[in-house]
A protein has these predicted regions:
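Asp-based, Mg2+/Mn2+-dependent phosphohydrolase catalytic module
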Residues: 1-4, 97-100, 113-220
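Active-site neighborhood of HAD-like aspartate-dependent phosphohydrolases
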Residues: 1-42
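Conserved SAM-binding loop
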Residues: 14, 88, 106, 141, ...
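Hydrophobic/aromatic residues within well-ordered alpha-helical segments
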Residues: 21-24, 45-49, 69-77, 113
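Helix-loop "lid/cap" segments that line or gate small-molecule binding pockets
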Residues: 28-29, 48-63, 120, 152-153
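Metal-dependent phosphoesterase signature
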Residues: 57-93
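Short, acidic loop-to-helix structural element flanking the phosphoryl-transfer center
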Residues: 81-108, 114, 118
């Protein structure tokens, strides 16, 4: 089935920031004399900052350190962003250039809060590619709820079923599927479970493979 618009996640899909975020959580926990396990960090991928805090609050060894953990995480993360270039995921520039050449509407759908999302897009020089950016600040419910992607489709004036979402995380892919959209998963830190992979249009090893698939679907 053809498509009319592409919706893209940001962290872990277009820019290589999920590792920075994970390290910020590690550093914040270490400063407080505790630690966050890797399995727990994997569960945070694709969630908004507030959703991350709610998840961590459920862990007794961490709940006692809130809200200091939240504050330190923000400080470490912003410091990392300000002290270096935001690395792009391989293939994202080629993909966005192709979407522009083909005049295919596209928008960002991110669980990051609005001001930080805009900062990341500006620093990574990806902002000019997008007229619409829907963030966690713009909706009542962030991923894995469908609100972000439904809002992005509405801004583009495209029916959800005519959108394809590019996502790296399980939470983000769940949001796309809940919005009745097709999703191509390009895993970053965590591979999707088999049940999720079966529901996806495809699981691609990188953005080059995702672009090739989009080109094939465009030619159908």
């Amino acid at each position: 089935m053809p498509y009319d618009a592409i919706l893209l996640d940001m962290d872990g899909l277009m820019i290589d920031t999920e590792q920075l975020c994970a390290q910020a959580w590690r550093d914040a926990a270490s400063e407080l004399g505790t630690r966050i396990g890797e399995d727990t960090l994997h569960q945070l991928v694709g969630l908004s900052h507030q959703h991350c805090l709610r998840y961590l609050q459920q862990h007794p060894e961490l709940s006692a350190h809130m809200p200091a953990l939240a504050l330190l995480n923000r400080q470490y993360y912003h410091r990392q962003l300000q002290h270096g270039d935001i690395p792009l995921k391989p293939g994202i520039t080629a993909l966005l250039d192709w979407l522009r050449q083909q005049a295919i509407p596209c928008a960002v759908g991110t669980a990051t809060e609005g001001p930080l999302a805009q900062l990341k897009l500006q620093c990574s020089q990806l902002a000019p590619y997008f007229q619409h950016v829907v963030s966690a600040s713009d909706v009542a419910n962030s991923k894995p709820a469908p609100d972000i992607y439904l809002a992005a489709a509405a801004r583009l004036q495209v029916e959800p079923a005519r959108c394809i979402v590019l996502e790296d995380s399980v939470h983000g892919a769940s949001a796309a599927l809940a919005a009745n959209m097709r999703v191509i998963i390009v895993p970053d830190i965590v591979q999707p479970p088999a049940t999720m992979a079966k529901q996806a249009l495809a699981v691609c090893k990188d953005l080059f493979a995702a672009q090739a698939l989009l080109q094939q679907l465009r030619d159908v």
